[in-house]
Amino acid sequence: MHISKPAGPLPASVPFYRQLYFQVVVAIILGALLGRFEPAFAESLKPLGDAFIKLVKMIIAPVIFLTIVTGIAGMTHLKTVGRVFGKAMVYFLFFSTLALVVGLVVAHVVQPGAGMNINPADLDQSAVKSYVEKSHDLTLVGFLMDIIPNSLIGAFTGDQVVNGKLTGPNILQVLFVAVLFGVSLALVGERGKPVLNLLEALIAPVFKLVHILMRAAPIGAFGAIAFTIGKYGVESLVNLAWLVGSFYLTSLLFVLVILGVVCRLCGFSVLKLIRYLKAELLLVLGTSSSESALPSLMEKMEKAGCEKSVVGLVVPTGYSFNLDGTNIYMTLAALFIAQATNTELTLGHQIALLAVAMLSSKGAAGVTGAGFITLAATLAVVPEVPVAGMALILGVDRFMSECRSLTNFIGNAVATVVVSRWENALDRDRLTLVLDGGEPPLLAPVGEPGVAPAALR
């Protein structure tokens, strides 16, 4: 990693009204107001949110590919790749399991579904039928096989056709191809240098494109939040407020207490990290998709002192294997349904639920509406909990989706710093400077001192 001093004086402070996080906040407020008072019109704005997410997905594959390939090809020892991946998977497995256990414990303590006395036979199962059907495709073997694309191009375009359209890039497939190509490039040595130089030269314009696309974030957040409030209404939260509130509070405590302790042990503050990522978090909140902020998260983590090779491996992998918010939601929602339908679950049933959830949460990687579909897959394997009970939470799932995405996002940001520190691939002075609000020296690609992609402010 080459660091150069900025040429000339630092740029003047950007006015608050031009900062992305302020624009996204205003957009979310306006979208919520429009959804509340003009719900019919607000529903028609859904394409704004969808279009922005498509724009971001368009650039995700190139960002991941370039970051991973240049990072791996620049490593002096290829054993480092396996070591980083192994450490990341150990971290992901531990904290994903911990999140599932936390959801289970909170459900027992809070009892959000107690006293509802719902008869599963009286519920409209047609509302959740499509989710249950999708969940049947989520198997561990199918998930592992899906990591391997049918072709190199297929990883970037999507191999499957849904409603006559290609599904788009698969993050894990792009990761798989990028790792193989990066290793191959490193093995050919000097002969691969021209290719590596070309890919490194492409990084700056690609991240500049990310910066340009992020300027449309307020429009996307406005459309997405207006649609959500307009379609589902704030009123739908009232009946299930105890469940929604329990989930939000549990996720907050998980981030501040559990992840907070991890951050403190690693020498930084989770609150400062959240402040540093405020623009991305607001974007995730507005679009209800942590994927929408993936490119800028990778950029921000590298800017904060994490080595590019570690960022390139940990962040995309974490988006599939480190879903803390989704895991909390799964066990909490499953026990809520059991309590609401007066279904008694023994300790054995709950251990089985935990084991199935550990596997099914990995099988939902990259699936739209992953939390709800994964819950359906889990309940289908644990027959004691009626799948029909999912109809109880269908109306508020969209409101819990934001919290799932935010928790997943923060969890992956923390994981990136922790694994970087674990791997001695973290510039601690730079991290401290950035989290304290300072402007660090520019990061420059090899051979191009002083040139760096514009970081999202």
Curated annotation (Swiss-Prot):
Disulfide bonds: none annotated. This is C4-dicarboxylate transport protein. It is found in: Cell inner membrane. The lineage of its organism: Bacteria, Pseudomonadati, Pseudomonadota, Gammaproteobacteria, Lysobacterales. InterPro entries: C4_dicarb_transport (IPR023954), Na-dicarboxylate_symporter (IPR001991), Na-dicarboxylate_symporter_CS (IPR018107), Na:dicarbo_symporter_sf (IPR036458). Signal peptide: none annotated. Coiled coil: none annotated. HAMAP family: C4_dicarb_transport (MF_01300). PROSITE patterns: NA_DICARBOXYL_SYMP_1, NA_DICARBOXYL_SYMP_2. The chain crosses the membrane at residues 22-42, 55-75, 90-110, 138-158, 168-188, 209-229, 242-262, 335-357, 376-396. PANTHER family: AEROBIC C4-DICARBOXYLATE TRANSPORT PROTEIN (PTHR42865:SF1), PROTON/GLUTAMATE-ASPARTATE SYMPORTER (PTHR42865). Responsible for the transport of dicarboxylates such as succinate, fumarate, and malate from the periplasm across the membrane. GO terms for cellular component: plasma membrane. Pfam families: SDF. GO terms for molecular function: fumarate transmembrane transporter activity; malate:proton symporter activity; succinate transmembrane transporter activity. Belongs to the dicarboxylate/amino acid:cation symporter (DAACS) (TC 2.A.23) family. It comes from the Bacteria. NCBIfam families: PRK01663.1, PRK13027.1. GO terms for biological process: L-aspartate transmembrane transport.
